[in-house]
C-alpha cells in the first residue's frame, strides 16, 4: 500500500486520485458534521458546491430535508443550521436528508469523484477510517480540505493520526508529505493543544465556537465510515 496526501481542495489532481482510495478530511468542521449527522440517524448527506444548488434540491419537499452549511464559518441565510456538528442531534436529523454546502469540505468531496472509493474522515472517526482503508487494501490518498486553498494544521494532524492507525497494523510506502504528517502527529498527540496554533482554530475561536473545536478534536468517539457515491454520502 502506498499512502500520499493532498494539502487542500485546490490541489486535487484527477490523475493523482484516479482509482485510488481517498479519505476526505475537513475536521473543522464539514466532515465532522457529516459523520455526526449520519451517526445520529440522518438517512443521507448530499454535499453541493453552491447555495443555489442546495435550495433547488429542497424546494419541492422541504420537510424531507435539512439545509446545513456555512460561508466564511457563518450560517447561510435561509439555512436551518450552520456548520456546527453540535447542531445535528438525533431529534433534528433522524430520518432526514441533510443537504450541505461549505467553503472547503464539500468542494474537496466533489473534487475526489474520480477515486475508486471516497471515505469521509475526521478525528472523531479516524480509527474506523483506518480500519476501512486496511480492508479495502488499495493505495490511499488523503485529501485535506484546507482553508480557502491553503494548508491547514488541523487537517494535517488528523491525516497523521489516520496514517499512524494504519501503520500499527501493516507496513506502507509513504510519500514525503505523508511521512511528515505522521511525524507531526507523533510529536503532537494532544490534538487540542496542537490545533490551537491553526489559523482556522482562531477563526472559529473568535466566533465563540470552542465547543465545536473541542468536539471535532476528540479521537474515535464515532465508529461509522461514511462513503460518498455521487450524489450522496451514506454510512
From Swiss-Prot:
Coiled-coil residue spans: none
Gene Ontology MF terms: 2-phosphosulfolactate phosphatase activity; magnesium ion binding; sulfopyruvate decarboxylase activity
Catalytic activity: (2R)-O-phospho-3-sulfolactate + H2O = (2R)-3-sulfolactate + phosphate
Cross-referenced Gene3D superfamilies: ComB-like
Domain of life: Bacteria
Cofactors that this protein relies on: Mg(2+)
The keyword Magnesium belongs to this UniProt entry's keyword annotation: yes
Assigned EC number: 3.1.3.71
Keywords: Hydrolase, Magnesium
Enzyme superclass (EC): hydrolase
Keyword Ion transport: no
Entry similarity comment: Belongs to the ComB family.
Protein name (Swiss-Prot/TrEMBL): Probable 2-phosphosulfolactate phosphatase
Organism: Clostridium novyi (strain NT)
Amino acid at each position: 500500500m502506498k499512502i500520499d496526501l493532498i494539502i487542500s481542495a485546490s490541489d486535487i489532481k484527477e490523475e493523482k486520485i484516479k482509482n485510488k482510495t481517498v479519505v476526505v478530511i475537513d475536521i473543522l468542521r464539514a466532515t465532522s458534521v457529516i459523520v455526526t449527522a449520519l451517526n445520529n440517524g440522518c438517512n443521507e448527506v448530499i454535499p453541493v458546491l453552491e447555495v443555489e444548488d442546495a435550495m433547488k434540491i429542497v424546494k419541492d419537499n422541504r420537510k424531507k430535508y435539512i439545509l446545513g452549511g456555512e460561508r466564511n464559518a457563518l450560517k447561510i441565510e435561509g439555512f436551518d443550521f450552520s456548520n456546527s456538528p453540535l447542531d445535528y442531534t438525533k431529534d433534528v436529523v433522524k430520518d432526514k436528508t441533510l443537504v450541505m454546502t461549505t467553503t472547503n469540505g464539500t468542494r474537496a468531496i466533489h473534487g475526489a469523484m474520480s477515486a475508486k472509493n471516497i471515505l469521509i474522515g475526521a478525528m472523531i472517526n479516524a480509527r474506523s477510517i483506518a480500519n476501512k482503508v486496511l480492508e479495502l487494501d488499495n493505495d490511499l490518498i488523503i485529501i485535506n480540505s484546507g482553508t480557502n486553498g491553503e494548508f491547514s494544521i488541523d487537517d494535517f494532524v488528523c491525516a497523521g493520526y489516520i496514517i499512524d492507525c494504519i501503520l500499527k497494523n501493516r507496513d506502507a510506502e509513504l510519500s514525503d508529505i505523508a511521512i511528515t504528517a505522521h511525524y507531526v502527529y507523533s510529536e503532537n498527540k494532544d490534538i487540542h493543544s496542537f490545533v490551537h496554533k491553526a489559523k482556522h482554530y482562531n477563526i472559529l475561536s473568535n466566533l465563540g465556537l470552542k465547543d465545536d473545536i473541542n468536539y471535532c478534536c476528540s479521537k474515535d468517539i464515532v465508529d461509522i465510515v461514511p462513503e460518498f457515491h455521487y450524489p450522496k454520502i451514506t454510512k
